[in-house]
A protein has these predicted regions:
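Charge-rich, low-complexity amphipathic helices
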Residues: 28, 32, 36, 49, ...
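N-terminal single-pass transmembrane signal-anchor helix
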Residues: 1-34
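Periplasmic/extracellular, small/polar-rich flexible segments of pilin-like filament-forming proteins
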Residues: 42-151
């Protein structure tokens, strides 16, 4: 009985740990996209409109087991250089399509927005998620503000 109780407590915590680990892997992967955007901004004085202009592969080719795609979007505004990092799966309630075990993050999109530097400052990145999951602890603390991911 004690083993059953311990298992009932430990299993959900372990599953949450696994999801957070997958999110961290996705955050590490997006660093290469950030670097390409920063280089483009340094050379052209503005943010790229899309992956091609940034010298990156197509969004679906920037992927991993835990990332469906990474798309550069300007939203028609060259002052905006957002990266949209889409997680695989389906976010529709009741849908069982979560092939990578991302839980509430399946099918959601995390956005990374650069802060335009003043003079020679380094570029800072804001992170946000618009389709906020019910399990917000799965999202890194720095990404829990949905407004920081939009222009």
């Amino acid at each position: 009985a004690i083993i059953g109780i311990l298992f009932a407590i430990a299993l959900p915590q372990y599953q949450n740990y696994q999801v957070r680990t997958k999110v961290v892997e996705a955050l590490v992967m997006v660093e290469t996209v950030k670097t390409a955007i920063e280089v483009y901004h340094e050379e052209h004085g503005r943010w790229p409109f899309d992956n091609e202009e940034a010298g990156l592969p197509a969004p679906s080719h920037i992927s991993s087991d835990y990332v469906h795609s990474a798309r550069v979007i300007a939203g028609g505004d060259p002052a905006c250089g957002i990266i949209a990092l889409k997680f695989p799966g389906n976010k529709n309630p009741g849908h069982k399509d979560d092939p990578m075990g991302l839980g509430a993050l399946a099918g959601t999109t995390m956005f990374f927005k650069p802060k335009k530097p003043d003079s020679d400052e380094t570029i800072e990145w804001y992170c946000g998620i618009l389709e906020f999951p019910r399990d917000q602890y799965l999202v890194p603390k720095e990404c829990r503000n949905p407004r920081k991911g939009t222009c």
